[in-house]
Amino acid sequence: MASGDFCAPGEGVEMLLQVCGKQFPPCALTEEDLIQNPRFSKLLLSLSQHVDESGLSLTLAKEQAQAWSEVRHRKTAWLRYEILQRVIQELLVDYYVKAQDTNLTSEDKKFHETLEQRLLVTELTQLSGPGQETELPPLLGLERTDLLELMPPSQDFVWMKARLQLEVEEQLKRKCFTLLCYHDPSSDTDGDTLKAAKVWTLTEVLVREKQQCLEAKSQQKEQLVLLEKKRTTYSQVLLRCLALLQRLLQEHRLQTKSELDRINAQYLELKCSAMILRLRMEELKVLSDTYSAEKVEMHRLIRDRLEGAIRLQEQDLEKSRLVLHTYEALGEDFESLVREYTQLRLAADNKRWALQELSKAQR
């Protein structure tokens, strides 16, 4: 394919612009850029076949997806363990609070004491167990076998485990209902069966709402980019219109010879000047909206330095003109003085050279 025909205006350019907008967002290319640089356009089209919408290569994107999948899997496992750990801690805290206010039954006391003992021994066993990088002395001088002896009886553990499952399920159920009522306050008056049905689909609802939020955020970003482009275009068009109006006003000023016409011309001139000032004010307003205060201040500094340099050059030029006028006023007498000074300078140089040679000969 010829380079001149690669990016001819049409559907090919539109397709390439869409590809660049999705896969190469920092480029911000225009249709004119693609038409004027066909080889670069061909390079972008070739690169688009090897990268995804985020700009990553397909291989790297696949590896990243696998890594994120592994991270999500490990995060899910950790969250399950962390949730169970926190629920058990909350059960123990509730037990301590109830023990201060009410008299608990013997079964409740036995359940919480067995749970606390089992949890404490398990944590100490993990701290003193293998799997550490460096050899550390036993915790408090206790070996793993010493800690295992502190475990509650097996029949108590089996009974506690069966009840713990019910307690954890009830605690998680209350938390799920609380989350559901926070997300949908109207569900507060529903029955447990209806709440359980809504909780079952709550995950899908949250995922769908999150996806909608992400899509809305992406659309908002695209709209902001489009709005910025339109704002720049409208500002440029408005500036051209203001310049055209100013030129038309200056070209069509009325000029008359009579006094009345002169007064009318002065009035129209003042009116045009006011209009020009107003147009200038609008132009400055558009420029202030287009350029930031830092850019305006930088332009002002550059202009001040250039004006200062111009003034210095004009002063040097004026001094040079004065010296030139002085030399021109002297005329032929000044030229004779220059020739005489040149002869004396040459004679002095010759005598100085002779003295140097004589001194060398004497040494």
From Swiss-Prot:
GO BP annotation list: cell division; centrosome cycle; spindle assembly
Where located? Cytoplasm, Cytoskeleton, Microtubule organizing center, Centrosome; Cytoplasm, Cytoskeleton, Spindle
Q: Where is the signal peptide?
A: none
Q: Which GO terms describe its cellular component?
A: centrosome; cytoplasm; HAUS complex; mitotic spindle microtubule
Instruction: Specify the domain of life of the species encoding this protein.
Output: Eukaryota
Pfam families according to UniProt:
HAUS4 (PF14735)
Which keywords label this protein? Answer: Cell cycle, Cell division, Cytoplasm, Cytoskeleton, Microtubule, Mitosis
Q: What subunit structure does UniProt give?
A: Component of the HAUS augmin-like complex. The complex interacts with the gamma-tubulin ring complex and this interaction is required for spindle assembly. Interacts with EML3 (phosphorylated at 'Thr-882').
- What's this chain's function? Contributes to mitotic spindle assembly, maintenance of centrosome integrity and completion of cytokinesis as part of the HAUS augmin-like complex.
Protein family (similarity comment): Belongs to the HAUS4 family.
Recorded protein name is: HAUS augmin-like complex subunit 4
Origin organism is Mus musculus (Mouse)
Which lineage ranks, top first, belong to the organism behind this chain? Eukaryota, Metazoa, Chordata, Craniata, Vertebrata
Q: Encoded by which gene?
A: Haus4
